[in-house]
Amino acid sequence: MDGDRGKRDSYWSTSPSGSTTKLASGWERSSKVDTWLLILSFTQWALSIATVIICIIISARQGYSMKEYSMTVEALNMSSREVKESLTSLIRQEVIARAVNIQSSVQTGIPVLLNKNSRDVIQMIDKSCSRQELTQLCESTIAVHHAEGIAPLEPHSFWRCPVGEPYLSSDPKISLLPGPSLLSGSTTISGCVRLPSLSIGEAIYAYSSNLITQGCADIGKSYQVLQLGYISLNSDMFPDLNPVVSHTYDINDNRKSCSVVATGTRGYQLCSMPTVDERTDYSSDGIEDLVLDVLDLKGSTKSHRYRNSEVDLDHPFSALYPSVGNGIATEGSLIFLGYGGLTTPLQGDTKCRTQGCQQVSQDTCNEALKITWLGGKQVVSVIIQVNDYLSERPKIRVTTIPITQNYLGAEGRLLKLGDRVYIYTRSSGWHSQLQIGVLDVSHPLTINWTPHEALSRPGNEECNWYNTCPKECISGVYTDAYPLSPDAANVATVTLYANTSRVNPTIMYSNTTNIINMLRIKDVQLEAAYTTTSCITHFGKGYCFHIIEINQKSLNTLQPMLFKTSIPKLCKAES
């Protein structure tokens, strides 16, 4: 440590030039401090004297200084106002200039940039869409969707109330809602349009119908027209069907009995392509060809044709047809309802009713499935499942609905609403009352039918509106119903309200025992045929589309017409 102190003293005692300096002694430092204190004391005394003199002068001139002070303040205020006005004017000019620039950018500059960017994006998409590997991606770029708040009516969500219990009301009476109809028609006087099929998906709808150019009899040639569109609101705030794209299939292909499904941005239809009449088809082994058509919103279409050997049938069939009414889409599959004649009948007891009927047994019901007019074939309903429907070659599998779960096989439709699948089948046999229920598509297939006593259909004399006793007959007409409540007890439909004739089309809202609210389309003599009803909600408010084949009597042809009603659901207040 002593060595280090010696080095430091040596450093500070040496100047940069190398010469040595003498360190000031303690006495010399003390003398300098006393001198500075004396100087500071004198300065303080001088400042005190100066302050006293200034105060005396101010007091002497006080009378004059107050007036000068006021004038000074006023001058300062005026100067401040001038500065304020100058600043305000300057700021206003700057703001106006900047606002003009912003307005110019918004009205001109930004739109120009947006248009340029839009063109760039469109060009990029077009270039991408020219590549085959991106075709599926590009097909999804067309933005078509139902109006906001519109969705297929789901009974579980619809049939409820904030307070109280829901019910169908008879007052006020339902009425037709105004709006246009753009269903496909005929360009010839004698043209006949038949078999309307409507599927309403989450984003779009699909509609299909068959056109025969001369009369309604099958002449071996017919057009099939498939439309895709969306549901919008018209100026009266009522829903409308708005077609976006339409495709007409070759008249020589003679598609028949087509069922449709709308899912995603595509429409699918499954049709039969018969080369013989129906009775001849049932009398021979094997089925006529089936065809699956695909149509997208860009108008692109694709068709897959299947021969008997290419369809996975669980039993040999002599005839098989899609059921006209719409099908459903599930994960990876399309499911259509179908019907046809088995080459060899199945064993088992079918749905039956013997109470109140004379000389009727279970055997009577079993034999009633075998239709003499169709070569004695046992007519059953089937599930037609199209697997991998997005692939290059979808596969078709047919599963027969057990005869223990069903009545006579017939036309019909499927609806997937919420977590339930609803089934409707035409009352073509002895059971004339409405046939609607819940289908369990797991194995084995089961149907929980909802008994309806109020709704029926016209039929021949032996199987008319009121018939409930088993016997062999093939009659009736396709008049499907849409479930409004989860148990399908409350429904919307269009019935031909007559005993034996296809007349008097009437829109009906009904429960299992009573017709609650109804509207006759015209009069009891108006001739009609097939009807189909599909319902939607718009932010919870229910509406139904009714498509009815109306007989243009002066022309003696059929033409589907579109009608719309508001669902008369109310809430019963709790007492």
Swiss-Prot record:
Gene3D superfamilies: 2.120.10.10. Residues 59-575 are virion surface. SUPFAM superfamilies: Sialidases. Keywords: Disulfide bond, Glycoprotein, Hemagglutinin, Host cell membrane, Host membrane, Host-virus interaction, Hydrolase, Membrane, Signal-anchor, Transmembrane, Transmembrane helix, Viral attachment to host cell, Viral envelope protein, Virion, Virus entry into host cell. One of its GO terms (biological process) is virion attachment to host cell. Residues 1-24 are annotated as: Disordered. The chain crosses the membrane at residues 38-58. InterPro entries: Hemagglutn-neuramid, Hemagglutn/HN, Sialidase_sf. GO terms for molecular function: exo-alpha-sialidase activity; host cell surface receptor binding. It is a single-pass type II membrane protein. This is Hemagglutinin-neuraminidase. It comes from Sendai virus (strain Fushimi) (SeV).
